[in-house]
């Protein structure tokens, strides 16, 4: 069973993200990755998921974002079960960067603003996100500034280092201004 996608992507604030007795196992696996996990995250506070490789940190994030569904247990945002939300509504709460962040063959500006095309004052918000992410230090390296094409699909495409792509992904996440990141 998959989430539906009905609504336009609007931003939502939240007060509490809660998981109760979460169990998740990958198909074909006997042992659950997460077994009876409970948590409560309050808005405005910082939390860190810490653990060994393979202990379920990324799995939990993907559960929270609706990419996976728990075998049992509930995840709620302000008391509403996320499985009752359509995918667009659920995604409006989150902004995340995974280990395999995306490299888009667009301009620098397009790479950043695609996370929130409806934002007002795009240039001002984009500049703030770029500076916070530490990507602005390379701005002088790009002949066309934020209009520089990235990637190898374009003849004039500029290639970025892994670290530069990572900072660009962080700028994209910050530009989105989601309540949970």
Predicted regions: what they are:
Residues 10-181:
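ABC-type nucleotide-binding domain
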Residues 2-12:
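Pre-NBD coupling/linker segments of ABC/ABC-like ATPases
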